[in-house]
Amino acid sequence: MNECHYDKHMDFFYNRSNTDTVDDWTGTKLVIVLCVGTFFCLFIFFSNSLVIAAVIKNRKFHFPFYYLLANLAAADFFAGIAYVFLMFNTGPVSKTLTVNRWFLRQGLLDSSLTASLTNLLVIAVERHMSIMRMRVHSNLTKKRVTLLILLVWAIAIFMGAVPTLGWNCLCNISACSSLAPIYSRSYLVFWTVSNLMAFLIMVVVYLRIYVYVKRKTNVLSPHTSGSISRRRTPMKLMKTVMTVLGAFVVCWTPGLVVLLLDGLNCRQCGVQHVKRWFLLLALLNSVVNPIIYSYKDEDMYGTMKKMICCFSQENPERRPSRIPSTVLSRSDTGSQYIEDSISQGAVCNKSTS
């Protein structure tokens, strides 16, 4: 029967995994990582709070897509909390942690990733429902959106708690990983592979929607008389969502690959030398998301700017490169326009034949 080590401190597990946490987290490297991490976290709290407040304040954003976007901002805000907790419980402090405190530290990080990933999956479903029906916004009710948001956080909390619930190596030291000394290598493989598969599924779904919208836009454009901005609205919205997805994949994939290599017990891969920099890269994702929202959406930018600078609502600054949310947020108007475009296109094709 294997001996369990619930009462041990983390120095016992770090020493067995040959992880030199003290040397790596002292001196210039530690100062750089902590300074950059602190700046990122402050920006995450500020910018994502603005996004959530903008969705609450501006009635143009009171639609399912923007509610889910606000929830993604909430997930990024939660990621900032997780990284702050990590910064206060890392370096030389890591070896003094109890098992339960270390589980909490890692569980917060795991939950933040799962919340963002699951939320992107829900947004993919919402976009698929609306675009395939040629509507700017889906017909999800507020009740259903609320249930989806609660489901996102329930899944995130559960995934973050799985190691604490028993999938760990406290009773089987030989199965412990190197980067996460009390996580089983089998759990790391499961967790990373499931996340990478979710990445792949999302990329395929969004590419399918993107190709569909692009094809429909090209077919309908010659037969419709609406403004260019309105004709291109579905494509612009898809480009915004795909930019968010692309940033998420780029920022998180390297870290997941490193964890997968550790789970596969790759001793020659040098995972210890890059883990902290890839962790900062993952943190960067929560930094760039609010920038993407404000850059791509004209009204989001205007609302956030007015909250910061107290500018007059009657004279918002215009930036033509962004999506006019007055078009995006009027679901019935946008949907009717697309439906009218389909009808006009059908009439033109019929008369031509």
Swiss-Prot record:
Signal sequence region: none
Localisation: Cell membrane
Biological process terms in GO annotation: adenylate cyclase-activating G protein-coupled receptor signaling pathway; bleb assembly; chemical synaptic transmission; collateral sprouting; G protein-coupled receptor signaling pathway, coupled to cyclic nucleotide second messenger; gene expression; positive regulation of calcium ion transport; positive regulation of collateral sprouting
Presence of keyword Transmembrane helix: yes
Matching CDD domains: 7tmA_LPAR3_Edg7
GO molecular function, one term: G protein-coupled receptor activity
Membrane topology: Multi-pass membrane protein
Extracellular compartment spans: 1-31, 89-101, 168-186, 262-276
GO CC, alphabetical: axon; cilium; cytoplasm; plasma membrane; synapse
Stretches assigned to the Cytoplasmic side: 53-67, 125-146, 208-240, 298-353
Known function: Receptor for lysophosphatidic acid (LPA), a mediator of diverse cellular activities. May play a role in the development of ovarian cancer. Seems to be coupled to the G(i)/G(o) and G(q) families of heteromeric G proteins.
PANTHER family: G-PROTEIN COUPLED RECEPTOR
Entry protein name: Lysophosphatidic acid receptor 3
Organism from which the protein derives: Homo sapiens
Gene this protein is translated from: LPAR3
